[in-house]
């Protein structure tokens, strides 16, 4: 199992180029199952979850190849089951279900795996598809969906805001008869990107980015070329790298207007932030950040995927900051690892109270999930001595070449293969 060895402390400064957003690329790749003609998807990050998705699509009969862009041809799909072997590593595979039942009248997906951060039930996906007329059975660890003829448009009020279920319902509804309205829909930029992709193929979706999405069903979707939006979480992670180390970081090929809540908190922490159309810069002028308090919330609130990075920021900041996690359970698993490096914090249910310390010391630590692992690597960059971060397969699921980008900012980091 690979590890990172990080020598600190380092002031992280320089430029990084932001990759395409994993959280948009994944639903877009699955939504390509709806297309009867070839699609080209640009700016897809090179990540483990993307590779797994392409393997899964290939098993369903999609012609999938990568040559700069990702090229998918789902015109000859002849298998409608996403098997356990591939699904077990990645929760996103549930997104195959809606397109399969919408286009082919049947689909089955093994109950999924992925990061171990609390309950992420597939119930909302299932009830949404049932409201569109699908019959759902849970058998032998598989979710099986079927419909006679086509799905039927419906007025769906979601019990709670869910990015995953919004994607499932929106994708499936593109080929339903009649009009579907999703109330209490998720508003994330990645939802907007998925809708824009589907519209490029001939779907009729309006309102994405608001809490009410309307989908007028069409007979078929064709092909097209689409570019995935930049990764706002990767952008935020590298900005935090600059903030905790007193550095100056410029993120190129970014989309700052998807990051309002994060940029506001970085300014509150004392950072000087500048933005352009496709870049954002942070300058700490050598200062320590000030602690900030925040609550995670669905977009446009503060993203849960930036919570671990801001926990780290608070733990090395001046003062005390309180972070409340409202989206997922078990999302403070990085905190005991940071405590091994000298961080002071208390966890009270869904709240983390961070008491900033002037410096961290190196330690051997273990990644527990994707964003937690990023915070541990950044902690190693600013800690005194050599930090070893174990189980970095988590980080490879969501960050493209993170060590190369950190090296470009001046980090002293190397990947050690499990054998060494």
Swiss-Prot record:
Gene3D superfamilies: Enolpyruvate transferase domain. Pathway: Cell wall biogenesis; peptidoglycan biosynthesis. UDP-N-acetyl-alpha-D-glucosamine binds at residues 91, 120-124, 160-163, 305, 327. Phosphoenolpyruvate binds at residues 22-23. The active site is at residue 115. GO terms for molecular function: UDP-N-acetylglucosamine 1-carboxyvinyltransferase activity. HAMAP family: MurA. Belongs to the EPSP synthase family. MurA subfamily. This is UDP-N-acetylglucosamine 1-carboxyvinyltransferase. It comes from Erwinia tasmaniensis (strain DSM 17950 / CFBP 7177 / CIP 109463 / NCPPB 4357 / Et1/99). The lineage of its organism: Bacteria, Pseudomonadati, Pseudomonadota, Gammaproteobacteria, Enterobacterales.
């Amino acid at each position: 199992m690979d590890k990172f060895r990080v020598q600190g402390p380092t002031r992280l400064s320089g430029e990084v180029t932001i990759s395409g957003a994993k959280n948009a690329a994944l639903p877009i790749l699955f939504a390509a199952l709806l297309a009867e003609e070839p699609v080209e998807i640009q700016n897809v990050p090179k990540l483990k979850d993307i590779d797994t998705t392409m393997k899964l699509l290939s098993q369903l009969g999609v012609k999938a190849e990568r040559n700069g862009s990702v090229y998918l041809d789902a015109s000859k799909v002849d298998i409608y089951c996403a098997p356990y072997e591939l699904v077990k590593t990645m929760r996103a595979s549930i997104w195959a279900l809606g397109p399969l039942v919408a286009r082919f009248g049947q689909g089955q997906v093994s109950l999924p795996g992925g990061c171990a951060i609390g309950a992420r039930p597939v119930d909302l996906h299932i009830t949404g598809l049932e409201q569109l007329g699908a019959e759902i059975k849970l058998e032998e660890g598989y979710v099986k969906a079927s419909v006679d003829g086509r799905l039927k448009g419906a007025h769906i009020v979601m019990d709670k805001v869910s990015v995953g279920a919004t994607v499932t319902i929106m994708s499936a509804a593109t080929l339903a008869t009649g009009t579907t309205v999703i109330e209490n829909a998720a508003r994330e930029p990645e939802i907007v990107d998925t809708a824009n992709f589907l519209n490029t193929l001939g779907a009729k979706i309006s309102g994405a980015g608001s809490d009410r999405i309307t989908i007028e069903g069409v007979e078929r979707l064709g092909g097209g070329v689409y570019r995935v939006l930049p990764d706002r979480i990767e952008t935020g992670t590298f900005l935090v790298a600059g903030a905790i180390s007193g550095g100056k970081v410029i993120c190129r090929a970014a989309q700052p207007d998807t990051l309002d809540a994060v940029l506001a908190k970085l300014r509150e922490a004392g950072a000087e932030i500048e933005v352009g159309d496709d870049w954002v810069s942070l300058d700490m002028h050598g200062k320590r950040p000030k602690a900030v308090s925040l609550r995670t919330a669905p977009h446009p609130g503060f993203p849960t995927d930036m919570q671990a990075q801001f926990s780290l920021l608070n733990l090395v900041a001046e003062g005390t900051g309180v972070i409340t996690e409202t989206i997922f359970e078990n999302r403070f698993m990085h905190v005991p690892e940071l405590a091994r490096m000298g961080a002071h914090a208390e966890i009270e249910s869904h709240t983390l109270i961070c008491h900033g310390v002037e410096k961290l010391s190196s330690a051997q630590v273990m990644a527990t999930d994707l964003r937690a692992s990023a915070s541990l690597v950044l902690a190693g960059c600013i800690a005194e001595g050599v930090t070893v971060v174990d189980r970095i397969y988590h980080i490879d699921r969501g960050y493209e070449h993170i060590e190369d980008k950190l090296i470009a900012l001046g980090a002293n980091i190397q990947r050690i293969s499990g054998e060494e």
